């Protein structure tokens, strides 16, 4: 491969050797590398000091690990040799404006310079499509969207350009352009727009098979110290960038990340960066490739005089990346930032992917470094003993995994370009095809599950992808252990003193006093329950209320990855099903005939549910039974609908209200504390978004219930914090109709089966939670509901004597708790609910969803 003009081999001094990196320590680390042992952070930093024969030894170990991974993945080329992959791409620099000031960057500019160059603030749609069309003619499969971070946050010109064209953000424009590229050219977008939130990535996933963001470094020193590489760049905060990696994992997005080598980081910081990537991938399995990129100084930047990364330093880092990240990770090095000889050396150090290489567009981030010609790169790869094969923007294992990783709205575009046997790219030119929402969901699968769950039970004990759907169980158990360590061993506040305080002002105690009440046992617990029962009597009297309703869980297809949930199935599982809109309406009519005043509709987050699906269900029920109260869609379902529609939360909720939605269930809350929440669930909405959705629903006239699921990995301090969140919302909106404590049903829960959760709450926990809720919510939420489905009749009666006043509903069918292993049935008649109340000497009364009492 000829050396391009101006391309010099890198030959610079090695970084300062860490004090611990003496010869004997290095020999020990190299021996561990030869033995296939994963290097810890200190060992990785020491290994990066290897030079000469030691470096050759290190690279040989890394190459063996790489080859083992390629063999395991079946990654062979046309000649039968192991294969190194690349993606044939076009580079689309959507905008060169950015709110950051990275000291090494020439990609980013300012509006004045763009104007002087005669360039637009953003690439116009026609420009983007022209590049993509020409790329398709060259056989490119990937459209790399690269741009600065949130330019509209800094530049008035960016805000004006977007506003004139009807976009509220750069990411909205990127999404629209990705759809146009898919539809008009068939190229697959790979989105690299910098830092994104959970909601933003949720919105972008349906238009791109993969996304990416370089972690670069975990060094806070480089971020916080004036004059260093990332100072003055808010989006280069390592904590923020690690959060992006985590959110991408929670959303099951095939994600590219990596590190920059030689921007002023120490070897220990470099090693820590690799381990941070390893930890994120271990938990979620979503990091599809790690780019190890060598720093190249550029003229007219603050770091123009900073030395390039030395080649031995670079090779050692690549080798260590391979050893830390293991055989299954694709390790990538940009071939245009090194010479041909150095490319061969990188292969020897464990590289197995060249990343995106364009036969058409320059590397706009490194414009002084042209891409090697593809035939030249293939020749270099062959000289190193490997075939070079073309892949898609998503690595093969994610392509072949299907709906678990690739959204169905872009799945067809991926399938059109993928070899079904390997997941690599087919030798075809892309062709545009429609990007559209799925059609109406048809009825299929075990649609009788609601009725059959009580007589026939489940067909399978667990869903088919139990081993892969929820992330790494070892990592999850470590998080549970950390939660347990932080749980208080004793309560300093005296329970009797807390009781006296609660008697004087139930809603005015300190958190410490509430925690004391929550941990009470024995006679103290009896006193807490008695106080709660007294408050109940004062607020709502002795009547036990209930609603005649029907649960309609319209689908159990879900890929969110809630680790506590035994209801969710993947498509094709023996217990999986979806109801058609017509079947849902039929069940609402059946409920009406049986005397129901409410249907409660919730379902899994099925990626094939059309954007109109939620409103269609509401309209169908209202058309069949105009008087039926529709209580439907958890905040997670609302977040999903908002993501699909592109509307704001407020706009989408108003649309549902106009379709006939009456109230929403305040489910999907679990525990409103993210340290617990991210153990319980992989991909569910974060606490802040749950609060925003519920608050907005109340503001547009959609009242809701409120809930808390307890008895898994939580502790009493989480109960207090959760109830405080609900109190704050109620103070602002007054929109909660009731509070429903939901005991964790453990029997079939993946989290419990993996040994990470308790076997549900104890009887003490149940009594304490119901009583605590009555006390803490006094004066704010009058109705405390207890779940006969989860507790059974006798324990339900105990809760009614300790603060609760409501039995929930008749349900008619219930699949969520029953699939989790609840043994208390899925339906109660009115007579049976009345009998529960009369069994403790209390009258029962039917109510509406919003607690208006109905005539006896």
From Swiss-Prot:
GO terms for cellular component: plasma membrane. Keywords: 4Fe-4S, Iron, Iron-sulfur, Lyase, Metal-binding, S-adenosyl-L-methionine, Transferase. Its EC number is 4.3.1.32, 2.5.1.147. One of its GO terms (biological process) is response to nitrosative stress. Binds 2 [4Fe-4S] clusters. The clusters are coordinated with 3 cysteines and an exchangeable S-adenosyl-L-methionine. It catalyses: 5-amino-6-(D-ribitylamino)uracil + L-tyrosine + S-adenosyl-L-methionine = 5-amino-5-(4-hydroxybenzyl)-6-(D-ribitylimino)-5,6-dihydrouracil + 2-iminoacetate + 5'-deoxyadenosine + L-methionine + H(+); 5-amino-5-(4-hydroxybenzyl)-6-(D-ribitylimino)-5,6-dihydrouracil + S-adenosyl-L-methionine = 7,8-didemethyl-8-hydroxy-5-deazariboflavin + 5'-deoxyadenosine + L-methionine + NH4(+) + H(+). GO terms for molecular function: 4 iron, 4 sulfur cluster binding; 5-amino-6-(D-ribitylamino)uracil--L-tyrosine 4-hydroxyphenyl transferase activity; 7,8-didemethyl-8-hydroxy-5-deazariboflavin synthase activity; metal ion binding. Residues 85-417 are annotated as: CofG-like. The keyword 4Fe-4S applies. [4Fe-4S] cluster 2 binds at residues 558, 562, 565. Its cofactor is [4Fe-4S] cluster. Residues 84-336, 544-785 form the Radical SAM core domain. Residues 521-854 are annotated as: CofH-like. [4Fe-4S] cluster 1 binds at residues 98, 102, 105. Pathway: Cofactor biosynthesis; coenzyme F0 biosynthesis. The keyword Transferase applies. In the N-terminal section; belongs to the radical SAM superfamily. CofG family. Catalyzes the radical-mediated synthesis of 7,8-didemethyl-8-hydroxy-5-deazariboflavin (FO) from 5-amino-6-(D-ribitylamino)uracil and L-tyrosine. HAMAP family: FO_synth_sub1, FO_synth_sub2. This is FO synthase. It comes from Mycobacterium tuberculosis (strain ATCC 25618 / H37Rv).
């Amino acid at each position: 491969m000829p050396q391009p003009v101006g391309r010099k081999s890198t030959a610079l001094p090695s970084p300062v050797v860490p004090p611990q990196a003496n010869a004997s320590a290095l020999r020990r680390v190299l021996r561990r590398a030869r033995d296939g042992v994963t290097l810890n952070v200190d060992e990785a930093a020491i290994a990066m000091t290897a030079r000469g024969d030691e470096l050759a030894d290190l690279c040989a170990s890394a190459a063996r690990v790489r080859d083992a991974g390629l063999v395991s993945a079946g990654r062979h080329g046309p000649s039968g040799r192991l294969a190194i992959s690349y993606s044939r791409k076009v580079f689309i620099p959507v905008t060169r404006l950015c709110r950051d000031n990275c000291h090494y960057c020439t990609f980013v500019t300012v509006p004045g310079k763009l104007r002087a160059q005669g360039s637009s603030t953003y690439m116009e749609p026609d420009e983007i499509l022209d590049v993509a069309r020409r790329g398709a003619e060259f056989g490119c499969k990937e459209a790399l969207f690269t741009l600065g971070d949130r330019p509209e946050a800094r530049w008035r010109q960016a805000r004006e350009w977007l506003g004139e064209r009807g976009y509220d953000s750069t990411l909205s424009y990127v999404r629209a352009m990705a759809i146009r590229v898919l539809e008009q050219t068939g190229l697959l977008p790979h989105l690299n727009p910098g830092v994104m939130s959970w909601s933003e990535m949720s919105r972008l996933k349906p238009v791109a098979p993969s996304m990416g963001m370089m972690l670069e470094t975990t060094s806070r020193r480089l971020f916080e110290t004036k004059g260093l590489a990332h100072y003055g760049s808010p989006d280069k905060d390592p904590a923020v960038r690690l959060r992006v990696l985590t959110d991408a994992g929670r959303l099951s997005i095939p994600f590219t990340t990596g590190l920059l080598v030689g921007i002023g980081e120490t070897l220990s910081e470099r090693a820590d960066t690799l381990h941070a990537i390893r930890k994120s991938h271990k938990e979620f399995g979503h990091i599809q490739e790690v780019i190890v990129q060598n720093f190249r100084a550029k003229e007219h930047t603050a770091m123009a005089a900073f030395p390039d990364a030395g080649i031995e330093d670079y090779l050692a880092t690549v080798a260590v990346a391979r050893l830390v990240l293991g055989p299954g990770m694709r390790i990538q090095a940009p071939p245009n930032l090194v010479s041909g000889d150095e490319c061969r050396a990188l292969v020897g150090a464990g590289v197995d992917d060249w990343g995106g290489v364009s036969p058409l567009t320059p590397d706009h981030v490194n414009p002084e470094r042209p891409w090697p010609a593809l035939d030249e790169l293939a020749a270099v790869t062959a000289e190193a003993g490997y075939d070079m094969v073309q892949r898609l923007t998503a690595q093969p294992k994610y392509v072949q995994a299907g709906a678990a990783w690739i959204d169905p709205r872009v799945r067809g575009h991926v399938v059109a370009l993928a070899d079904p046997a390997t997941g690599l790219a087919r030798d075809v030119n892309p062709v545009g095809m429609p990007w559209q929402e799925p059609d109406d969901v048809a009825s299929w699968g075990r649609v009788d599950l609601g009725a059959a769950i009580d007589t026939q039970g489940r067909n399978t004990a667990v869903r088919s992808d139990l081993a892969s759907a929820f992330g790494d169980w070892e990592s999850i158990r470590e998080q549970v252990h950390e939660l347990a360590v932080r749980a208080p061993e004793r309560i300093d506040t005296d329970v009797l003193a807390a009781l006296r305080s609660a008697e004087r002002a139930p809603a005015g105690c300190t958190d410490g006093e509430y925690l004391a009440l929550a941990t009470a046992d024995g006679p103290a617990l009896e006193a807490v329950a008695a106080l709660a029962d007294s408050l109940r009597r004062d607020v709502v009297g002795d009547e036990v209320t209930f609603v005649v309703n029907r649960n309609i869980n319209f689908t159990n297809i879900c890929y969110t990855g809630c680790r506590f949930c035994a209801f969710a199935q993947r498509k094709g599982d023996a217990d999986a099903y979806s109801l058609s809109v017509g079947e849902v309406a039929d069940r609402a009519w059946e409920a009406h005939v049986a005397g129901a005043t409410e249907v409660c509709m919730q379902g899994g987050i099925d990626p094939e549910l059309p954007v109109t699906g939620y409103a269609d269900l509401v309209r169908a029920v209202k058309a069949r039974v105009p008087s039926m109260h529709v209580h439907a869609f958890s905040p997670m379902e609302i977040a999903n609908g908002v993501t699909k529609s592109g509307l704001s939360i407020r706009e989408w909720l108003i649309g549902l209200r106009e379709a006939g939605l009456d109230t929403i269930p305040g489910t999907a809350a679990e525990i409103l504390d993210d340290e617990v929440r991210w153990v319980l669930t992989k991909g569910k909405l974060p606490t802040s978004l749950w609060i925003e959705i519920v608050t907005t629903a109340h503001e547009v006239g959609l009242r809701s219930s409120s809930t808390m699921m307890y008895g898994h990995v939580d502790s009493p301090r989480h109960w207090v914090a959760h109830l405080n969140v609900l109190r704050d919302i109620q103070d602002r909106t007054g929109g909660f109709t009731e509070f429903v404590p939901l005991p964790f049903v453990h029997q079939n829960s993946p989290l419990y089966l993996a040994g990470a959760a308790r076997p549900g709450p104890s009887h003490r926990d149940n009594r304490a939670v119901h009583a605590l809720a009555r006390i803490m919510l006094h004066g704010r939420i009058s109705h405390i509901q207890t779940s006969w489905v989860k507790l059974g009749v006798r324990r339900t009666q105990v809760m009614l004597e300790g603060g609760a006043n409501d039995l929930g509903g008749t349900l008619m069918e219930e699949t969520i708790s029953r699939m989790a292993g609840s043994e208390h049935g899925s339906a109660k008649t009115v007579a049976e609910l009345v009998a529960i109340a009369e069994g403790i000497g209390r009258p029962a009364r039917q109510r509406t969803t919003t607690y208006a009492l109905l005539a006896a």
